[in-house]
Amino acid sequence: MFVVGKGCKRFNSNAMKDYLIPVTNTTKISVGLIWLFHISGLFGILFIDRELFLETTPINLFVTFIMLFVNQPQMDKGVGFAAGFAFIVGFAVEFLGVNYGLIFGEYAYGNNLGLKVGGVPLLIGANWVMLTFITGAVAAIFFNTSAIKAAAFGAFLMVLIDLVIEPVAPKFDFWEFADVTAPLSNYIGWFLVAFPIQWVYQTQVKLKDRVFSFHLVLVQFFFFGAFSLIQLAS
């Protein structure tokens, strides 16, 4: 048992199993599928057909997006508002970044994230929603009495996920910065944009999915972390 700080839930480490072990059949199937998708994707990209598996990325993202909402404990106006806010703000800042080099730096999207509008894949808006919801749900496990602290921690988790993805994004033809390596402004921009989106999520979504979100966060670090380590070792 440990206490993280004021405004933070008194967290029993033995209760971690509550967030790792799915209870309902829907969650069991969903968690099994996301691990299956990413483990098979890892081996498929490495050992079978790199291009074929990377081209299925939009399908993977879309199916995962649907599963995220299937696993929400409650679908109400708060969930809809938080999702819409994350999509619109996320897509808007990406549009500014791609077309004007603002916020994140100068970069362009590749071809493996599907249909683009104004140079930005539509699925990127959905990806902002997914990242907001899953990191926000995990943040709320630790900071369940302070929306501000939960929003800050959720935004920090989003930056960490981006940090893990950035080294492999160009090789996967997801996106690439003008200077190849993502600048510091990218990570600062991510936090500054993610924080208000996270705050909306924390204040609007009253009942948060824990298990599916926890596993999806783990999957992101596992999948992209593995490729980043392989790239560093090569």
What spans do the regions from the language model cover?
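Aromatic-rich, lipid-facing transmembrane alpha helices and their immediate juxtamembrane interface loops
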Residues: 2-234
